[in-house]
Amino acid sequence: LNQVIETLLNHRSVRDFEDKPLTWEQVETIVASAQAASTSSFLQAYSIIGVTDREKKEKLAEVVGNQPYVAKNGHFFVFCADLHRHAVVGEMENVDVTSPIESTEKFMVAVVDASLAAQNAAAAAESMGLGICYIGGVRNNLEAVRQILKTPDHVLPVFGMAVGYPASLNDRKPRLPLRHVYMENEYQQDEQLYKKQLEEYNEIVAGYYAERTGGKRRDTWTGQMASMLEKKARMYMKEFVAKIKMNIR
């Protein structure tokens, strides 16, 4: 395997960082790598906010669910789906772009663009010996995040990313087997096979937790997912997204 593939396959989330800031050169390289990601129709419909102000980082750490690694890391990035720039383009070119930038299609484009950029950033950071952790908790209270980061309409903070020097490393979590996520020619709809594969994966995940905790935990993947999905989390999202004039057409 080449170094790129080894870096990708060695990914694990880091939640314990040294209190050591990244250099500007490191930040610049990570952002440049993010910008090199594919983007739909050259729209580049995202922005990246680097949060260096300690007070803002501490506020964000509280808002996202009291996650200390949001405040203590080398650098904290927030990746935003951004169509505000395109509203400005409409003004500059004297073209009414209201309907397109408020459409579901352009909303999806912006979220995908932000996600592709973020994954490039993650790969770049890890190739530099740094650790990363995506922070979906940014979406716990988007109104508060919006106030902290002063984002305008047509800009949605999608997730954060803590980056820094790992103080400790977690084990890599086993992923779903390839045969369960890769399908050729058509979607696999054999429910019995589907369930059999998930039961096999449950054994792998339970073994992972048992080894990691000395036998104290034997969580299954389906059990974890069922517990998470039965909670009505972030049900305000549709209304908030409409409030900032996205995904309403």
Where do the model's predicted regions map?
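Acidic, surface-exposed loops and disordered segments
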Residues: 1-249
